[in-house]
Amino acid sequence: GCLGDKCDYNNGCCSGYVCSRTWKWCVLAGP
């Protein structure tokens, strides 16, 4: 998933995004 898509530890995100443990959706990866 990309920005705002739901995710979890077993469901990754698009390149450049990471799964937020807090909100359980994809957010921009930090530096």
UniProtKB/Swiss-Prot annotation:
Keywords, alphabetical: Disulfide bond, Ion channel impairing toxin, Knottin, Secreted, Toxin
Compartments where located: Secreted
Tissue: Expressed by the venom gland.
Pfam families: Toxin_12
Gene Ontology molecular functions: ion channel inhibitor activity; toxin activity
Gene Ontology CC: extracellular region
Superkingdom assignment: Eukaryota
Disulfide bonds: 2-14, 7-19, 13-26
InterPro entries registered for this protein in UniProt: Huwentoxin-1 (IPR011696), Huwentoxin_CS1 (IPR013140)
Domain commentary: The presence of a 'disulfide through disulfide knot' structurally defines this protein as a knottin.
Family assignment from sequence similarity: Belongs to the neurotoxin 10 (Hwtx-1) family. 51 (Hntx-8) subfamily. Hntx-8 sub-subfamily.
Role this protein plays: Agglutinates erythrocytes.
Protein name, per record: U2-theraphotoxin-Hhn1a
Organism whose genome encodes this protein: Cyriopagopus hainanus (Chinese bird spider)
